[in-house]
Structure formats: structure tokens, C-alpha cells
Amino acid sequence: MKISILTLFPEMFSIFNHSIIGRAQENNIVELELLNIRDNTLDKHKKVDDYPYGGGAGMVMAPQPIIDTIRKAKENNKGKVIFLGPRGKTFNQKMAMDLSKEENLIFLCGHYEGIDERVYKHIDMEVSLGDFILTGGEMAAIPVIDSILRLIPGVLGKEESFVDESFSEDLLEYPQYTRPYEFEGEHVPEILLSGHHENIRKWRRLQSLDLTRKRRPDLYKNVILTKEDKKLLGRKNK
């Protein structure tokens, strides 16, 4: 997959040069292209924003630099143009899975008080992280892109790594433990030391169900319980 990122602050995405995504780039599994919107402005002072018509606080990103940067990206990337903004649908794991199946994507990061309305006709999709305010689109783009890339085959190394993670099927992940066995009076559950893989699997499933029911009822209502799930929950409630 190739992802083109349109931004005023390309240095913010240096985080992708490290860890899992860094290795995926080295192995040519994914390609990240950074395009600085400021490089495409026609203003001699490299200005990319201006005062809003009708008055109001702050500055608005002008259409010309953004649209020209989108056109430049599309010269070698025919993917959907995704804008990180408050009007969009709230991003979730299903959206990440759907987008991970695309061959290419283009992400547009806004800044200041927003973008000129005339840019929207060049945008295919708008997504939001939630009902709160961030300094810029870059801060929203990083987790969105990361969540998409880790679903691409070969990025994590083995499929089980993301199948078992939180939200992969509307469930929170089960509790994890490592050494030491005892820490400040708390012990690792004995079942995890039993070596009985089927019992461990059932225990983990029950923990995921129980945690989701208690902490994320909004997710739990979407869970389709299997016969085994109902049996496990029934035993716990006795």
C-alpha cells in the first residue's frame, strides 16, 4: 500500500520511521509519501492561509495550495482522498479494516480554523477521531494511518497479532501478564500457568466478554454471543 500524506508539518510523521511501521517500509510492504502543502503555494511568501470572508477568529487554509497538492499526489497515487475533520464519521476498527484493503490512500491534514469549503469537492471521505478539538489534522492522521497499516498482511508478522487485539470483533482484549509471577502481593491467574490451551482460550474469551460488558456497553450491544459465550457467562453468574 502507498499512502500519501498532505501536510504543513511533514516532520511530525517521523514517528513512522520507527518500530513496526518503520520495518514495514524497509521491507517494501508499505510506502509513505510526505507532501508539504506549503511547497505548492503560488504565494511568494509561502503563505497558505488567509482571513475568513465575513469575519471571525483565526485563519482558513486557502484552496489553491491544497488542491494543487492533491493534484500532485494523484500523479502517482489514485487512492481515495481522506480528510481528517470534525464533519466526518467517527473512525473505528471496521473503517480501518475496510481502508486497509485499498491499494493506495491520500490523507489531507488541515490546520488553523479549517479549510476553504471549495476544497471539499476534491475530498472522497472525511473522518473524525471524536467530539474534541485537536491542534491539527496531523495528530488525528497518525493514529488513523497506524491502525490501517497494522492490518496489512506482513506488517505485524502474523495474523494472530491483530485478530486477538481489542476491537477486532467489538470486544476489549483480555488481561495480559508477564513475569514475575508475584508482584506486590498480586499473582498471575493460575489458569495461565496450567499449559491447558483450551481452558486458557475460554478464560481469555470470558475476560474479554466481561470487560467489554462492564466498561464498553456501547460495544457489547453489538456482540453476537455464541452458544459457548452464553455458557461461559452463565457459569460466571452462578
Swiss-Prot record:
Coiled coil spans: none
Record keywords, A-Z: Cytoplasm, Methyltransferase, S-adenosyl-L-methionine, Transferase, tRNA processing
Compartments where located: Cytoplasm
Keyword S-adenosyl-L-methionine: yes
GO-annotated biological processes: tRNA N1-guanine methylation
GO cellular component: cytosol
Pfam families: tRNA_m1G_MT
Enzyme Commission number, as recorded: 2.1.1.228
Family matches, as InterPro entries: Alpha/beta_knot_MTases, tRNA_m1G_MeTrfase_C_sf, tRNA_m1G_MeTrfase_TrmD, tRNA_m1G_MTases_N, tRNA_MeTrfase_TRMD/TRM10
Binding-site positions, S-adenosyl-L-methionine: 110, 129-134
Disulfide bridges in this chain: none
Reaction equations catalysed: guanosine(37) in tRNA + S-adenosyl-L-methionine = N(1)-methylguanosine(37) in tRNA + S-adenosyl-L-homocysteine + H(+)
Entry's Gene Ontology molecular function annotations: tRNA (guanine(37)-N1)-methyltransferase activity
Main localization, broad class: cytoplasm
Quaternary data: Homodimer.
Family according to the record: Belongs to the RNA methyltransferase TrmD family.
Function: Specifically methylates guanosine-37 in various tRNAs.
UniProt name for this protein: tRNA (guanine-N(1)-)-methyltransferase
Organism classification: Bacteria, Bacillati, Bacillota, Clostridia, Eubacteriales
